[in-house]
Swiss-Prot record:
Domain ATP-grasp: 107-285
UniProt superkingdom: Bacteria
InterPro entries named in the record: ATP-grasp, ATP-grasp_RimK-type, ATP_grasp_subdomain_1
Gene Ontology CC entries for this record: cytoplasm
GO biological processes: SOS response
Database matches in PANTHER family: BETA-CITRYLGLUTAMATE SYNTHASE B-RELATED, RIBOSOMAL PROTEIN S6 MODIFICATION PROTEIN
GO function terms (MF aspect): ATP binding; metal ion binding; ribosomal S6-glutamic acid ligase activity
Protein name (record): Uncharacterized protein MG011 homolog
Length: 285
C-alpha cells in the first residue's frame, strides 16, 4: 500500500464566533501546527457572516470546536475525518441528552429532569439551560419563590438537578483519542457553587487513582474518539459521579497549570495519526 501523504490536504478548525473570540490564540495555534505538517489549515467561523468560506471545498480533516453539527450536511462534509464525531457533539451539548446517555450506559451521574415547577418539591436545586456551558445560565435555587425570578420562556430548554454538596469541587479529565491527557481539580470560589475556571474557581492538577482513571477510560471508550473533557465529582465512596461532557473543552486552565505542555501540538500530532488511519481505510477496496 502506498504511503499516505498529508502535504496540501485541506483541514479546517471550526468555531462559533463567541468561543473563537475567547480562544483566538489556541485556535490559531492548531492551524499553525497543521500547516507545519504541510497541510493547508484554515479557521471557519460558523456564525460570522463576514467569514471567508472559500476554503471549505474538498476539506478532508475537520477539527470541530463549534458545538454544532448542522454545517456538516450543509457543506457535504460527511466523508471528511471529523474531530469530534457527531454523536459526541450531540451528547455533549444537551445536558439532558448527556444524562440520558450516561444512564443508558449505566454510568453514575446526577439525577436530571426536564424543568416543571409543579414537580419540584424539595430544595435546594440547580436549574440549568440544556445548552449552557462555562457556568452561564446555571442557578442555585433555594425556594419556589426564586424559581419565579428565572428567565425561563421555554421549560423544555431547562433541566433540574439536586444540589450536591460535593459539587463545589469538580474534576475535569481531558480526553484525547481515548487516553486521559491530564486531570485538573476545580474548587468553587467563596460562596459561589460553580466550580468553573471562567467563574474564578481555584485550579490545580490532580493525579487520578488507577481505578478512577480506568472508569474514565471506560466512559471515553463508549463515547468515542476525539478531543473532549469529562467533568465529574467524587462522592464519599470515591466513586465518579459524571456531571457533564464538554466537547469544546477550554484549555486555559490546563495551559496555566502545564505551561510546558504544547497542547495544540499534542492534539494535532494525535489527530494526524488517526487521520492517516482514516485515509488508509478509504483506500481499501
Amino acid at each position: 500500500m502506498a504511503k499516505i501523504k498529508l502535504k496540501n490536504r485541506k483541514a479546517l478548525v471550526v468555531y462559533n464566533k463567541t468561543d473563537f473570540d475567547k480562544n483566538k490564540h489556541f485556535a490559531q495555534a492548531l492551524v499553525d501546527e497543521l500547516n507545519k505538517k504541510k497541510l493547508v489549515g484554515h479557521i471557519l467561523l460558523l456564525d460570522d457572516e463576514t467569514a471567508d468560506h472559500k476554503h471549505i471545498k474538498n476539506v478532508e480533516l475537520i477539527i470541530n470546536r463549534s458545538r454544532r453539527i448542522d454545517f456538516l450536511t450543509k457543506h457535504n462534509f460527511l466523508n471528511s475525518f471529523l474531530i469530534n464525531p457527531q454523536n459526541i457533539v450531540l451528547v455533549a451539548n444537551d445536558k439532558y441528552e448527556t444524562y440520558r446517555w450516561l444512564k443508558q450506559h449505566k454510568f453514575l451521574t446526577v439525577d436530571t429532569t426536564i424543568f416543571d415547577p409543579k414537580k419540584i418539591k424539595t430544595f435546594p436545586i440547580v436549574i440549568k439551560k440544556r445548552d449552557s456551558y462555562g457556568g452561564e445560565d446555571v442557578h442555585l435555587i433555594q425556594n419556589a419563590e426564586e424559581i419565579k425570578q428565572l428567565p425561563i420562556q421555554n421549560p423544555n430548554e431547562w433541566i433540574v438537578q439536586p444540589f450536591l454538596s460535593i459539587g463545589k469541587v469538580e474534576y475535569r479529565a481531558y480526553i484525547l483519542f481515548g487516553k486521559v491527557l491530564k486531570t485538573i481539580r476545580r474548587t468553587a470560589s467563596g460562596d459561589d457553587f460553580r466550580a468553573n475556571y471562567s467563574q474564578n474557581a481555584a485550579v490545580d492538577l490532580f493525579k487520578l487513582k488507577w481505578y478512577i482513571k480506568h472508569k474514565i477510560k471506560r466512559i471515553a471508550k463508549k463515547l468515542g474518539h476525539g478531543y473532549y473533557a469529562i467533568d465529574f465529582f467524587l462522592n464519599k465512596y470515591n466513586r465518579i459521579v459524571v456531571n457533564e461532557i464538554e466537547d469544546a473543552a477550554g484549555a486555559r486552565a490546563l495551559t496555566k497549570m502545564c505551561p510546558d505542555l504544547n497542547l495544540p501540538r499534542v492534539i494535532i500530532k494525535s489527530s494526524l495519526t488517526h487521520f492517516k488511519h482514516h485515509l488508509k481505510r478509504q483506500m481499501i477496496p
